[in-house]
């Protein structure tokens, strides 16, 4: 698995139109916190029990074949590593993790999107 900063991931997606951006956060994060424009939502895990989604790989396969590059993003770049490893194990050979994620880590005031992440870098995003 390769790792890209949010600006690198955005540039990669623009340069590779066959690449797919998968947002693996929970449904509530995706809908209410926001998500990168053009991303596909497939939860790695979700509430209320936060169990790993047993259909994750199959759901991603419906969106992208194992031959297409898959860029995967979560909140801060942790869940996306686990999700990316599952995709590699299933035969995906071009998996890219977005370092920093959509919101990045907490700052000194315990707020996200103030230090790093997709939103911090001013990349295109939307909310539902």
Give residue spans per PLM region.
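Rhodanese-like catalytic fold shared by cysteine-dependent sulfurtransferases
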Residues: 1-19, 27-69, 80-128
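Short, surface-exposed ligand- or partner-binding patches at beta-edge/loop junctions that are enriched
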Residues: 72-73
């Amino acid at each position: 698995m390769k790792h890209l900063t949010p600006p690198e991931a955005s540039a990669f997606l623009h340069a590779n139109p066959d690449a797919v951006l998968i947002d693996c956060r929970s449904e509530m994060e995706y809908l209410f916190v926001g998500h990168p424009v053009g991303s596909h939502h497939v939860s790695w895990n979700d509430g209320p029990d936060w169990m790993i989604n047993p259909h994750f790989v199959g759901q991603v396969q419906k969106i992208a074949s194992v031959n297409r590059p898959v860029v995967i993003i979560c909140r801060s770049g942790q869940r996306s590593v686990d999700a990316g490893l599952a995709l590699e194990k299933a035969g995906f050979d071009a998996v890219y993790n977005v370092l920093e994620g959509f919101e990045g880590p907490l700052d000194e005031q315990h707020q996200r999107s103030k230090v790093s992440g997709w939103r911090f870098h001013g990349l295109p995003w939307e909310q539902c």
